[in-house]
């Protein structure tokens, strides 16, 4: 959530920066609500002052032994008016809050201007795409004989669900374990096992609600009269980041670096017809997430560090990739700046997103009321960052395609072999 004081001080400037990312701020609605708030607040304060003055008069009259009934009646009437005015002020504040909950973050000054993904800026590349001496297969054709089972997944749960069997299941598990071990043993993260179901207010904290309710899977428990609505997490960023909600941390507790391997559940409401074949876009997929909670002055250094941590995974797996800075028009709702890592997918002859690393600055922290004591000992909002380290299913796609062999086998990347008992190749089952 944006700082409402910023809108009050520079509404036109905020509207311009939001327009850069393709969002039109309802300036008229905000201005009208602000005027109503100021008027109601002024009236409430005037009534408070009048009541205080009358209370002093009552004391003086009693001291003189004079009748106070008329003044006390006026005080009582003012009290009733103040209650109504306070209720009105609360209602206006809620409408302002609801308006702000739908407003995205402001882009950092270093973010390139652009309307959509075509105007993202490439930062660097690593690795050289392999030149194959045979016709390249996509991961579906490579993986199906090795245990990638789309038919059973669809039979059990419908489209965009997949079952992994045998060698493929082991490889998938090895990838996640390798990622977690790298982040905890070399990058300083603490591993967390997180709930996969959260309460609605948790999603407001990280920005999935109210705007992206259609992208979430909702679950209900209890009978008709006592139904409780909760949500399946679309990323463990949600639960990891909210561990500091409603907290005031000591400065020496920062930075906090957390990582988790979890399934993620997304309805993909806006992606009909996109990536319908294979593992690229699923309703359920695994991801290793990185989250950092830091002091504001260190957050952009932390962002670069986090990108480096995701890059390390790709480099150890020997997967070619590139780093992209997202332009203003392509960033996620909560982000002030985002880097995407895109891995080379041979069958598509292109790079595809495998990690997204974002600094949300104080946007999520303000919604969560996550603070720390600064050098002056005063509570100040932390900055929160999140990044994929990596999406496990998409990494599996990249391994199957980049390490495929002409005979249908797949060479296991060297970094993964200790997690597979030294296995060097996934072999086709004997006929």
UniProtKB/Swiss-Prot annotation:
Keywords: Aminoacyl-tRNA synthetase, ATP-binding, Cytoplasm, Ligase, Nucleotide-binding, Protein biosynthesis. SUPFAM superfamilies: Class II aaRS and biotin synthetases, tRNA-binding arm. GO terms for biological process: selenocysteine biosynthetic process; seryl-tRNA aminoacylation. The keyword Repeat does not apply. It catalyses: tRNA(Ser) + L-serine + ATP = L-seryl-tRNA(Ser) + AMP + diphosphate + H(+); tRNA(Sec) + L-serine + ATP = L-seryl-tRNA(Sec) + AMP + diphosphate + H(+). ATP binds at residues 266-268, 353-356. The keyword Chloroplast does not apply. L-serine binds at residues 235-237, 289, 388. Pathway: Aminoacyl-tRNA biosynthesis; selenocysteinyl-tRNA(Sec) biosynthesis; L-seryl-tRNA(Sec) from L-serine and tRNA(Sec): step 1/1. Homodimer. The tRNA molecule binds across the dimer. Catalyzes the attachment of serine to tRNA(Ser). Is also able to aminoacylate tRNA(Sec) with serine, to form the misacylated tRNA L-seryl-tRNA(Sec), which will be further converted into selenocysteinyl-tRNA(Sec). NCBIfam families: serS. Belongs to the class-II aminoacyl-tRNA synthetase family. Type-1 seryl-tRNA synthetase subfamily. This is Serine--tRNA ligase. It comes from Paraburkholderia xenovorans (strain LB400).
